[in-house]
Amino acid sequence: MDQAAQDNRIRSVVIVGGGTAGWMAAASLQRHFQGSPLKITLIESSEIGTIGVGEATIPTIRNFYQNLGLSDLDVMRATGATCKLGIRFNDWLKPGSSFLHPFGLFGQDLRGVPFHHYWLRLKALGDESEIGEYSLGASLAKGGKFTQPSRNPPSSLSVFDWALHLDASLFAKLMRQVAENAGVKRIDARITRVNLRPEDGFIASVDLDTGATVEGELFIDCSGFRGLLIE
């Protein structure tokens, strides 16, 4: 890397807001740039409470926390999570209607033709089977059952995936623990002013209610609906 490229590298990131978004961003960035000179600071106020709601995730959440060095059991124990095989949509087609969108495949492609074409053909011929009946994940969910998918691609048990339903506040707490253990700095304060660079309007620093000013090269707004930086 030449000197010009090195001089253009971002060396300080300031994340405004904690919660799941803020601490996930902090933990992920710290992990990705581990060993680099990048300094990550997260600013949040303990005076602003969080709501411990249930968080409905999709399977990619498991890739996310596994990249942080956490196992499924680590996260489930820390957040009281339960296994999730899909998402149910109520009243989408019409009032009283419902369908389950499972994580995984429907049926089996045949002769290079995607399975849903065969299902639509059956529908046209009068078959009343719902497409969910051809999904292992949907069938497991309907029966209140769960098993780990097979890691062997040819296996019929490899065609579905799963995620977690967890407590958002507990997951944020876990992400904070991971981030701080990796070196992220936390500042407990409220932001009173956002200072912009006159030459281009980019954020230069933020003033805190403690009287301190925090400078940064990249600012990430995770303050939710308040939009402290983006509004």
Show where each model-derived region lies.
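A short, basic/flexible loop-to-alpha-helix module at the beginning of a structural domain
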Residues: M1-I10
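N-terminal Rossmann-like FAD-binding beta1-loop-alpha1 element of flavoenzymes
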Residues: R11-L38
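The conserved SAM/SAH-binding core of class I Rossmann-like methyltransferase domains
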Residues: V16, I43, A189
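Glycine-rich FAD pyrophosphate-binding loop
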Residues: Q30-V53
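Dinucleotide-binding Rossmann-like beta1-alpha1 core, especially the glycine-rich loop
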Residues: G52-A141
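Alpha-helix-centered segments that form part of catalytic cores
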Residues: E128-S169
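Predominantly flavin-linked oxidoreductase catalytic cores and closely associated redox partners
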Residues: P153-E231
